[in-house]
Amino acid sequence: VLSNNHPLARKSMITVKELKALPLILRSASSDTRNLFRAHLESHNMSLDDFNVILEIDNIGTIKNLVRREIGVSILSRSVCLDELKKGSLSVLPIENLSMVREINILYHRDFRHEDLLQTILKEYNKAIRNYAV
């Protein structure tokens, strides 16, 4: 995530090399998005120590404000930036060769007999996911 005024905001994608050169604002170590990013880096023999991390903040709103003010860039879920994307105040760029797709699992007891309810839940979930596409 970066400010719409950032020179890289016009690109369709950012590389890890470009990201390493930018001031990076991260969420706390307990953040799922941060952990997905960290896991991807580790799978490519990299770590967060390879980046210019300037702040770690747990408040998403504060991170977005700092990014808007061009203090740094961040790794955030696209879904938390929907309002800013619509307003044009932030840009969300995919990172080249980086997939941060979360796996969602639905568990239910083997004796559960309400398949119609499961189908309804899945339909609603899929509708909600489509609403996040910008």
Give residue ranges: language-model regions.
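Hydrophobic hinge/microswitch elements
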Residues: 33, 38-90
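Secondary-structure junction motif
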Residues: 8-9, 23-45, 115-116, 132-133
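Short helix-loop capping/hinge motifs at secondary-structure junctions, enriched
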Residues: 5-16, 111-117
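Short Pro/Gly-enriched coil loops immediately N-terminal to beta-strands
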Residues: 1-3, 12-20, 88, 95-103
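A late-sequence structural motif
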Residues: 91-134
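Residues embedded in well-ordered beta-strands
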Residues: 1, 7, 23, 73, ...
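Alpha-helical segments flanking ligand/cofactor-binding loops in enzyme cores
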Residues: 17, 64-65, 119
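Thr-Gly-centered strand-to-loop micro-motif
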Residues: 2-3, 27-28, 76
